[in-house]
Amino acid sequence: MRTQWPSPAKLNLFLYITGQRADGYHTLQTLFQFLDYGDTISIELRDDGDIRLLTPVEGVEHEDNLIVRAARLLMKTAADSGRLSTGSGANISIDKRLPMGGGLGGGSSNAATVLVALNHLWQCGLSMDELAEMGLTLGADVPVFVRGHAAFAEGVGEIFTPVDPPEKWYLVAHPGVSIPTPVIFKDPELPRNTPKRSIETLLKCEFSNDCEVIARKRFREVDVVLSWLLEYAPSRLTGTGACVFAEFDTESEARQVLEQAPEWLNGFVARGVNLSPLHRAML
């Protein structure tokens, strides 16, 4: 029997770089919110202990794919603690809608969905805290997708506080380029000393993204798309890019702007949600 599981996108509603540690990692403050839009992961259980990804990603080796790594990590962790039945395996496929290198968290979301789904299907019984701890070894953003609630994150992105920002509508646009995160974080002109503020203060301020100035300067495509969106609504970069988003109070407003978009603009309309569609599907 095949089951389907949502793997939603996320937006960074704001992102501030507050410093850089001696080990090179940047400290930050950011606000994560999910979208009711994303990839769909299909899982069919096997009884031979094998993990097979039926929809490989071009340019990514099977064992390097975050989906496979997440499945194998859960398999080992559960087996080592005696919580995995002998022969547990899975065929996994993905209907991919989220772009790679877009700042929407696609790979991290995929890994989190696999952890949560296989924990349920294999009846491992691991807690969300245990799954989130495992997820952190796969990527800094994986835990927020595992926990499934909009969150304020700080530290190097590993300290989470659940929050409930307004659930607005967004027009999300992809400029057609992929921006590797290190390109932004290694840029010498990246702001690295934004003052730390409390959650309460940040939620009252106008939101912005410290990475945006670098993305716009280094990638003309980002600047062009963002300039167009800013003519219609408050707009900014998500994560380290490349995707940008415009914020609206209603779905109809967002769709009206999308209908006016030039042919070269690749975008979609989605609602921001504080409870992940993955966790909503499990209720």
From Swiss-Prot:
Pfam families tied to this protein: GHMP_kinases_C, GHMP_kinases_N
Reactions that this protein is recorded to catalyse: 4-CDP-2-C-methyl-D-erythritol + ATP = 4-CDP-2-C-methyl-D-erythritol 2-phosphate + ADP + H(+)
Residues at the active site: 10, 141
GO MF terms, alphabetically ordered: 4-(cytidine 5'-diphospho)-2-C-methyl-D-erythritol kinase activity; ATP binding
EC code: 2.7.1.148
InterPro entries associated with the record: GHMP_kinase_C_dom, GHMP_kinase_C_sf, GHMP_kinase_N_dom, IspE, Ribosomal_Su5_D2-typ_SF, Ribsml_uS5_D2-typ_fold_subgr
Keywords: ATP-binding, Isoprene biosynthesis, Kinase, Nucleotide-binding, Transferase
BP GO annotations: isopentenyl diphosphate biosynthetic process, methylerythritol 4-phosphate pathway; terpenoid biosynthetic process
Keyword Kinase: yes
Record has Acyltransferase as a keyword: no
UniProt superkingdom: Bacteria
Residues the record lists as binding ATP: 99-109
EC top class, as a word: transferase
Annotated pathway: Isoprenoid biosynthesis; isopentenyl diphosphate biosynthesis via DXP pathway; isopentenyl diphosphate from 1-deoxy-D-xylulose 5-phosphate: step 3/6
Subunit structure: Homodimer.
PANTHER family to which the protein is assigned, alphabetical: 4-DIPHOSPHOCYTIDYL-2-C-METHYL-D-ERYTHRITOL KINASE, CHLOROPLASTIC (PTHR43527:SF2)
Record-stated family: Belongs to the GHMP kinase family. IspE subfamily.
Protein purpose: Catalyzes the phosphorylation of the position 2 hydroxy group of 4-diphosphocytidyl-2C-methyl-D-erythritol.
Name the UniProt record assigns to this protein: 4-diphosphocytidyl-2-C-methyl-D-erythritol kinase
Source organism of the structure: Escherichia coli O127:H6 (strain E2348/69 / EPEC)
Organism phylogeny: Bacteria, Pseudomonadati, Pseudomonadota, Gammaproteobacteria, Enterobacterales
